[in-house]
């Protein structure tokens, strides 16, 4: 059976959560006997940050051999940003217009890959397949975020296109009701992300010379909001001189990164708050962590949070944050607090002064992630894909 994973987005060297999920799905489905291909859209050439298994064919829609190379170009990017200033919906339509140029290339990918099923990783990708190409190949559309965040400013044509999906997958049970507000659709399926737990268990209650609060995620203000963590830590840093904050993640949002660095300097935290960038050695990060701090505004099913909890690190998040407020159970595997630096600071301090509490809730965190074991999640996907083929 031929399976095409479609993610029309930058992919070369990009360390996003969606790309991480795609890499894992490619490996899991290949192990289950599928012939897997991947199509992405990137003006750059090179390798993905998260490697694909040997034997998985990777197509770049913008650089298809023997076909016209597509350039999004500075003009298109500028037009998109101008549109965004007036309407997020207009900006997304502008984004789609770039992919719409690539219809011949996408048709060529379908001819070469001959998929029995396509899994679409982003809404504009699904729109191109289901509206632009009107393909009869069954498409499973993945929703990688809170539907309120996805669809509030989504173009109507994008929503109508997604309604042609064979199935739409959501990451949390509560997301089905949210998605139903925007889509006239009744074939939603809940499958969470898999939690890949390395062969290690950490002890967040152990004695160390330096204790660490860790945050992992791209450094960006609208979603991940690392500035709140810095503000929270600044309130208690002098009380806990043997504690540091390590922030791991892509720093492509240069304006926000500059603001974060300024905030660190303003509070005199240069020696204890560090922007570490990206890494492929997460085991070492987890072994050094005592608390996982996650001040996100909204999430779909955060890989970093779930993996930190899976190795036994207690977490702090906001009760208002979608997905986080379902993964973290207050005082069972972490703390859920009202949004804001003050409450976040108090929760951090509760953990920082009590090693046994960290150890106890860390054990709870590890236990709570077991239902998301890879074999359970990928078996669910295998069943769903085969259901699509059976319905043909």
Please identify what each model-predicted range represents.
Residues 314-318:
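Short hydrophobic beta-strand element within catalytic cores of glycosyltransferases
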Residues 4, 205-224, 230-233:
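Conserved donor-binding/catalytic core segment of Leloir-type glycosyltransferases
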Residues 258-277:
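Nucleotide-activated donor-binding/catalytic signature segment of Leloir-type glycosyltransferases, i.e.
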Residues 39-45, 216, 244-259:
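Glycosyltransferase donor-sugar binding loop
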Residues 319, 329-331, 335-342, 350-356, ...:
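Conserved acidic donor-binding segment of nucleotide-sugar-dependent glycosyltransferases
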Residues 149-153, 180, 194-211:
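Acidic anion/phosphate-binding donor-loop and adjacent secondary structure
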Residues 16-24, 220-238, 245, 258:
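A conserved mid-protein helix/loop that constitutes part of the nucleotide-sugar donor-binding site
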Residues 278, 297:
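Aromatic "clamp/platform" in nucleotide-sugar-dependent glycosyltransferases that forms part
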């Amino acid at each position: 059976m031929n399976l095409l994973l479609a993610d029309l987005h930058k992919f070369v060297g990009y360390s996003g959560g969606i790309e991480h999920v795609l890499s894992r799905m490619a490996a899991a489905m290949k192990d289950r006997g599928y012939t897997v291909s991947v199509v992405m859209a990137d003006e750059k050439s090179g390798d993905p940050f998260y490697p694909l298994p040997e034997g998985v064919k990777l197509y770049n829609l913008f650089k298809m051999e023997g076909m016209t190379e597509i350039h999004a170009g500075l003009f298109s990017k500028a037009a998109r940003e101008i549109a965004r200033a007036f309407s997020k919906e207009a900006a997304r339509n502008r984004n789609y217009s770039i992919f719409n140029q690539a219809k011949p290339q996408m048709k060529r990918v379908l001819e070469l890959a001959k998929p029995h099923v396509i899994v679409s990783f982003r809404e504009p990708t699904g729109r191109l397949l289901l509206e632009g190409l009107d393909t009869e190949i069954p498409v499973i559309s993945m929703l990688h975020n809170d539907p309120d965040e996805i669809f509030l400013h989504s173009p109507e044509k994008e929503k109508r296109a997604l309604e042609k999906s064979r199935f739409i997958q959501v990451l949390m049970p509560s997301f089905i009701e949210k998605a139903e507000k925007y889509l006239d659709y009744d074939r939603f399926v809940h499958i969470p992300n898999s939690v890949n737990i390395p062969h290690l268990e950490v002890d967040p209650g152990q004695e160390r010379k330096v204790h660490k609060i860790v945050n992992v995620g791209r450094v960006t203000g609208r979603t991940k909001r690392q500035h709140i963590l810095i503000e929270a830590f600044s309130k208690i840093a002098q009380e806990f001189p043997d504690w540091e904050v390590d922030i791991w993640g892509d720093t492509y949002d240069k304006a926000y990164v500059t603001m974060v660095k300024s905030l660190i300097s303003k509070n005199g935290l240069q020696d204890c708050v560090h922007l570490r960038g990206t890494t492929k050695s997460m085991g070492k990060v987890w072994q050094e962590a005592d608390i996982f701090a996650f001040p996100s505004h909204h999430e779909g099913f955060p890989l970093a949070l779930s993996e930190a909890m899976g190795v036994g690190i207690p977490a702090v998040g906001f009760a208002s944050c979608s997905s986080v407020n379902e993964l973290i159970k207050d005082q069972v595997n972490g703390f859920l607090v009202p949004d804001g630096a003050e409450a976040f600071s108090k929760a951090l301090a509760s953990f920082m002064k009590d090693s046994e509490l960290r150890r106890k809730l860390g054990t709870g965190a590890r236990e709570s992630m077991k239902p998301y074991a890879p074999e359970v999640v990928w078996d669910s996907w295998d069943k769903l894909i085969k259901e699509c083929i059976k319905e043909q």
